[in-house]
Amino acid sequence: MEKLANTQEPIDKLISKRWSPRAFNPEFIIDKKSILSLFEAARWAPSCYGDQPWKFILFLKDDITPWTRALNCLSIGNQNWAMDASILIVVCANKLFTHNNEPNRWSQYDTGASAENICLQASSLGLAAHQMGGFDEAKIRNLSN
């Protein structure tokens, strides 16, 4: 489904067609090539010193046990629609530079840019991405341990 934004000024179609649906086809399974394309787009996001402070934790619906654990970290409202998503991605930011272990004040900004690249690449592939903040941070942290 293509849904173009009603903009006040002209913007690129890639941006105007990006939106965050709350309905996904429960039968759809994302293919490996598309997943690799999403993360390649993330890799090309700008970052301070080229540090790429992001980390992604990927949960595929066809690997149901870890995917369900990730789904259960979401708020009930987000679980209601995310349960039909083919993939769940946890986006994390490293708060320290890798080259000197000093605080990276721009890590969240840079990580946000990489997440937006994923959203735009999803849109260019005819897929949809929906970022969300409604989750239990402690539960998410336990997923990666």
Language-model-detected regions and their locations in the chain:
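N-terminal amphipathic, basic helical "cap/leader" segment at the start of enzyme domains
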Residues: M1-I87
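Hydrophobic transmembrane alpha-helix bundles
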Residues: S16-S20, S86-H99, S123-A128
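Small-aliphatic-rich amphipathic alpha-helix that forms the alpha element of a beta-alpha
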Residues: A42-R43, I89, N101-L143
